[in-house]
């Protein structure tokens, strides 16, 4: 178990000095959606480093074998976080993007379904992993990553997201006994 007392079932305590680097884009990717754009944060080295440090802090003493980063912006955060935590990185991709044999997990969208995949030999059974994504919205993608990890019989020590959209209640799809850190919440 880790010492992630601030992330078990809750979000962080409030905005940080870099939170202004996340901007709202109205009507993207479709009308009625307000998109949380993290690219201004990514382009500012010191603020990006501060955000990563906040994401990493609760997991620094947790033994990990890898970070699972969910496509696409979860790759950016996940790979950087894996380096910060001195562990491996495993990409969780959209269908048909990984060569070789993959495991597939389907999940529900508002209208229809989608899938994510990872290599079936990415990690040995029992490996300890942290799942990372940029935004927790409805929780479908994060829940699908849990399904992939379960197929490989991985031990999920927790999940970390940069932003949680509270109104969409994605946290309700997460496991109650597995810590979930949202560095910022809106």
Swiss-Prot record:
PROSITE patterns xref list: PUR_PYR_PR_TRANSFER
EC number: 2.4.2.7
GO molecular function, one term: adenine phosphoribosyltransferase activity
Pathway: Purine metabolism; AMP biosynthesis via salvage pathway; AMP from adenine: step 1/1
InterPro entries: Ade_phspho_trans (IPR005764), PRibTrfase_dom (IPR000836), PRTase-like (IPR029057), UPRTase/APRTase (IPR050054)
Chain coiled-coil ranges: none
GO biological process: adenine salvage; AMP salvage; purine ribonucleoside salvage
Disulfide bonds: none
One Gene Ontology cellular component: cytoplasm
Top EC class of this enzyme: transferase
Keywords assigned by UniProt, alphabetized: Cytoplasm, Glycosyltransferase, Purine salvage, Transferase
SUPFAM superfamilies in the cross-refs: PRTase-like
Presence of the UniProt keyword Oxidoreductase in the record: no
Catalytic activity: AMP + diphosphate = 5-phospho-alpha-D-ribose 1-diphosphate + adenine
Transmembrane segment boundaries: none
Pfam families tied to this protein: Pribosyltran
Compartments reported by the entry: Cytoplasm
Record family assignment: Belongs to the purine/pyrimidine phosphoribosyltransferase family.
Task performed by this protein: Catalyzes a salvage reaction resulting in the formation of AMP, that is energically less costly than de novo synthesis.
Quaternary structure and interacting proteins, as annotated: Homodimer.
Entries under PANTHER family matching the protein: ADENINE PHOSPHORIBOSYLTRANSFERASE
Annotated protein name in UniProt: Adenine phosphoribosyltransferase
Species of origin: Xanthomonas campestris pv. campestris (strain B100)
Encoding gene, per UniProt annotation: apt
């Amino acid at each position: 178990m880790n010492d992630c007392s601030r992330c078990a079932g809750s979000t962080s305590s409030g905005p940080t000095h870099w939170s202004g680097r996340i901007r709202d884009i109205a009507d993207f990717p479709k009308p009625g959606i307000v998109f949380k754009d993290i690219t201004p944060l990514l382009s500012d080295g010191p603020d990006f480093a501060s955000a990563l440090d906040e994401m990493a802090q609760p997991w620094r003493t947790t033994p990990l074998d890898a970070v699972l980063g969910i496509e696409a912006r979860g790759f950016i955060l996940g790979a950087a976080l894996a380096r910060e935590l001195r562990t491996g990185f495993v990409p969780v991709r959209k269908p048909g993007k990984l060569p070789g044999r993959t495991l597939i997990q389907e999940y529900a969208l508002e209208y229809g379904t989608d899938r994510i995949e990872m290599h079936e030999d990415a990690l040995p059974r029992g490996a300890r992993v942290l799942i990372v994504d940029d935004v927790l919205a409805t929780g479908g993608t994060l829940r699908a990553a849990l399904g992939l990890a379960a197929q490989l019989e991985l031990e999920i020590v927790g999940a970390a997201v940069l932003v949680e959209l509270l109104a969409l209640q994605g946290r309700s799809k997460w496991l109650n006994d597995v810590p979930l850190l949202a560095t910022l919440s809106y």
